[in-house]
Design a protein with these regions (language model features):
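Short extracytoplasmic
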Residues: 52-83
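A cross-kingdom signal targeting lumenal/periplasmic-facing segments of multi-pass membrane
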Residues: 80, 84-220, 224-229
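N-terminal Sec-pathway targeting helices
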Residues: 9-23
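Active-site-proximal structural scaffolding
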Residues: 24-25, 51, 214
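N-terminal Lys/Arg-rich, disordered targeting/topogenic segments
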Residues: 1-10
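Membrane-interface motif at the C-terminal end of an N-terminal transmembrane signal
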Residues: 30-42
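Alpha-helical transmembrane signal-anchor/signal-peptide segments
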Residues: 39-55
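Hydrophobic membrane-insertion alpha-helices, especially the h-region
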Residues: 19-33
Length: 231
């Protein structure tokens, strides 16, 4: 189910986001007092080095390591940056950045801020609900859906925040849970999961095709993530 920038939803989200921000500020103040002398502990997890290179019809390859300056800016403790391909030449770029702690200034960077900095302009934005068929997991997950463009090139971007078994599309809700879990669980570990699929201008219904490919990739990817992003 696709929601493309609906105005009533946008207004409701804006009001809700303001309320969340206020609550996060209040909760953060309380958390700073409660957690001042408590060392943070994150559950053990598998390294992305061990993440499968093949995902049920998708075969991947690791991209060159990121520049040290970029990694310093991102502040990730572990990350995965790969390109995956299907036999029918469909492709998907996968980035997952994991943060063991977000207490010392290292925080997840939203693609909404990073992609324009790389020259990509947002053309459409909304939410996409992806059905998941795997035991012990949600039956569907909600993700951010963006179409971006640079020159004549267009790409479809799906991304979400994942922490402690939750999949969160809204950036403000992710901040709320970050502070709440810091207070109640003494944990701030979390990850950003981003999937990018090129939109082939030469194909009919190119955007719809790209979305179908992205959904298929997410459905193969998501059931494997819990071992690397602990709940």
């Amino acid at each position: 189910m696709l929601l493309l920038n609906p105005l009533p939803r946008l207004f409701e989200d804006t009001m809700l986001n303001r309320a969340i921000v206020l609550f996060v500020v209040l909760l953060a103040g309380a958390g700073a007092v409660v957690q001042a002398n408590r060392p943070e502990t994150a559950p053990p997890r598998a390294s992305f080095d061990n993440f499968p290179i093949e995902l049920a019809g998708w075969k991947g390859q690791s991209l060159p390591p990121m520049d040290a300056k970029i990694l310093q800016i991102l502040g990730v403790d572990d990350y995965m940056n790969r390109a995956y391909f299907r036999a029918d030449r469909a492709s998907a770029g996968l980035y997952v950045g994991y943060y063991k702690s977000q207490r010392q200034g290292d925080a997840i960077h939203s693609p909404q801020n990073c992609l324009p900095g790389a020259g990509w302009e947002p053309m459409e934005n909304g939410y996409l609900t992806v059905p998941i068929a795997a035991a012990g997991l949600p039956t569907e997950i909600s993700e951010n859906r963006y179409v971006i463009q640079k020159g004549l090139d267009r790409q479809l971007v799906l991304y979400w925040y994942q922490s402690h078994g939750r999949v969160i599309a809204n950036e403000y809700w992710s901040k709320f849970y970050l502070i709440r879990d810091a207070v109640t669980l003494n944990r701030t570990d979390a990850a950003l999961v981003r999937v990018i699929v090129p939109i082939a201008a030469s194909l009919e219904n190119a955007e719809s095709r790209a979305e179908t490919q992205a959904v298929d990739f997410v459905q193969k990817l998501f059931p494997l993530l819990p071992a690397y992003l602990p709940s």
